[in-house]
Amino acid sequence: KMDWTIEKAVELGVSHIVPLLSARSVVKLDGARAEKRVQHWQRLVVAAAMQCGRSRLPEIAPIQPVGTWLASLPAPQTHEQRWVLSPLAESSLMAQARALAAQAGAPPAEDHQNPPGDAVASKAGATTAWLLCGPESGLAETEVDQALSLGWQPALLGPRVLRTETAGLVGLTVLQAALGDLG
């Protein structure tokens, strides 16, 4: 599943992929197995980038626990927006991304006529959009709480329950459509 997700994320234009271990993760990789898996994913990144004509390769970070990764991040900058997918969120990722674009004075997403290669969120004044998606059973409440305490915004994808590989890619696509990189 992760192979497919990485391949499609590369095609969608992500710049960083951070494989995370959640309290609810089914697969637990560590040590040499984790290193081998990251090397495998790096080969997938190269192949996917070649396939879709990308000149910049996304970075694959080492596998790490969600809490460790969140704690290691610097505070959000003005040019960043961070979302955590949560079924308990009160508003959708699309609504939040569109509101961000509107605040920055960007035209509605359906009006965008972007040349190829525009960065996600470029019309909204943000140069970096982060999306945190949990495993099949979702992030643990403590993991979501940690993200929220660090400035992440909770977001829904809609009324459906999606598989993790689908949720991440739908989230990326929603951000691209709302912020002007797709369409």
Regions found by a protein language model. Give the residues of each.
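A C-terminal functional module that forms or caps the active site or interfaces directly
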Residues: 128-146
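RNA substrate-binding interface of SAM-dependent RNA methyltransferases
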Residues: 1-84
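Residue-level preference for the first positions of well-ordered beta-strands
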Residues: 81-82, 126-130
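Structured adenosyl-cofactor binding patch, chiefly the S-adenosyl-L-methionine
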Residues: 140-183
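Intrinsically disordered, low-complexity terminal tails and inter-domain linkers enriched
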Residues: 75-77, 92-127
